Amino acid sequence: MEEQPQAVDIKAINEKIEKESAFVELLTLEINKVIVGQKHMVERLLIGLLGKGHVLLEGVPGLAKTLAINTLSQAVSGAFSRIQFTPDLLPADVIGTLIYNMKANDFTIKKGPVFANFVLADEINRAPAKVQSALLEAMQEKQVTIGDETFSLDRPFLVMATQNPVEQEGTYPLPEAQVDRFMLKTVIDYPKLEDEQQIVRSNLKGAFEKINPVVSVKEILSAQKSVTEVYMDEKIEKYILDIIFATRYPERYNLDELKPLISFGASPRGSINLATAAKCYAFIKRRGYVIPEDVRAVILDVLRHRIGLTYEAEAENITSEDIINKIVNVIEVP
């Protein structure tokens, strides 16, 4: 006899999430005391934090990327560290190293800047691959080995890496396999005119608002657990899988014209991260269940770095965003 699926009390889940997500508004208001505009970037940082993921931000210098994660760490009363990636950086500069202590005639461990709740990897594409992979391994494993000892990293642990657009000289592009480890890749644009006017005024005054801790690290860890309880219907799961499979086998979804443009589609990590990001987005919107609009809201940030383009696509100036938008327009919404 087949086991009957348990009935889900969506109303109870919704009430619980509505109560537990109340801090999001407080946190956003606190961050907005310093960050003008850039709502999309702040929202994506929160999704990364709640979904235990990491965020890759791409944009020209001077768009408040560093300020955003620093402000978030202050509002959450977490430890913050910044790593400026340069061509001469070594893996030990990121994760830490053993230092010889002459007095004790022994080696002591010096932990690197990766031991913090919020780590800013500034201009990650300016350092060689071995340094990039040292950080990305720490992100994936949530632990670091120095000498013979293995150390767990702090919780919560959010890495926000920034990257200048690849056209700029002196950069080492992140390999596809490494980029795939980022839950989200967000492209940051210039602020609107009225926002920039406000930025200029506040900078000229020189009076910056003090950021107060409004959420504890413990509350964030509890919220990360609550996000997993956000209800996702089977129809939404199927919708996510259809989108992912359409990036791999477009011909199955009457998208034959995309086949010559895609060299590889999104991996299962893409499916997991799309589902997680949709749950986080619902949580931020103080809802205990996922709707198709949640999936569509995060889809570009989750998938833009997971689809490989052929030379043909590049020659025609077709981007991964164009492909995602075509797929979303064709896949039936539940």
Regions found by a protein language model. Name each.
Residues 44-47, 100-120, 149:
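Conserved alpha-helical scaffold flanking the Walker A/P-loop in AAA+ ATPase domains
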Residues 13-21, 34, 171-172, 185-257, ...:
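Conserved C-terminal "switch" segment of AAA+ ATPases
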Residues 101-105, 123, 127, 131, ...:
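Canonical AAA+ ATPase core
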Residues 60, 94, 162:
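P-loop (Walker A) phosphate-binding loop of NTP-binding proteins
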Residues 1-17, 250-334:
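C-terminal engagement/docking regions of AAA+ P-loop ATPases
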Residues 59, 122-123, 134:
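Walker B catalytic acidic pair
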